[in-house]
């Protein structure tokens, strides 16, 4: 359920030590979204590397101030779609959008599925989302970093810290990440 995903995600975000990478198509300004935003800002102030990608066209109603607050707290924020003029360029970019919903925490915990960040998943909408640990998280991390670079985000020269080796007690079952 949306409640369960939100509770688990908030707990995992709270426990993040190294990095939080978050990429969402749809990020509302409702109560749950504000709690996640506050948590991201808190973790950035604590020294956790927090990167956030939002799909600009889907979130066009959100004023820049909302994201600027995140930036001031140390969250690195990028728009996936940056519409450019003239109008003919804008039209060709409307189909080049980021529909992913990905969270990677410390390179060890991942979330993906159909749920965006919205209170609508608590009451009206139903979708599937997964919490992943183990080797499969590397595929989500790769997908996020690819989107981050595409969105003009700056990257570190050393990627190894974002791909930690799995501990023996973590899942090593094969999984396929189909990035689209």
Could you describe each region identified by the protein language model?
Residues 1-180:
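Charged, low-complexity intrinsically disordered terminal segments
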């Amino acid at each position: 359920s949306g409640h369960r995903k939100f509770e688990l995600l908030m707990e995992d975000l709270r426990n993040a030590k190294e990095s939080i990478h978050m990429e969402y198509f749809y990020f509302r300004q409702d109560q749950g979204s504000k709690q996640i935003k506050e948590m991201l800002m808190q973790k950035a102030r604590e020294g956790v590397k927090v990167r956030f990608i939002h799909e600009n066209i889907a979130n066009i109603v959100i004023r820049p101030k909302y994201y600027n607050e995140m930036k001031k707290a140390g969250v690195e924020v990028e728009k996936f779609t940056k519409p450019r003029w003239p109008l003919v360029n804008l039209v060709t970019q409307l189909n080049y959008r980021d529909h992913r919903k990905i969270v990677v925490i410390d390179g060890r915990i991942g979330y993906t599925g159909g749920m965006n960040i919205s209170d609508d998943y608590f009451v009206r909408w139903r979708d599937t989302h997964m919490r992943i640990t183990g080797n499969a998280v590397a595929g989500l991390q790769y997908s996020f970093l690819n989107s981050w670079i595409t969105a003009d985000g700056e990257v570190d020269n050393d990627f190894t810290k974002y791909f930690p080796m799995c501990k023996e007690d973590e899942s090593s079952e094969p999984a396929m990440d189909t990035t689209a």
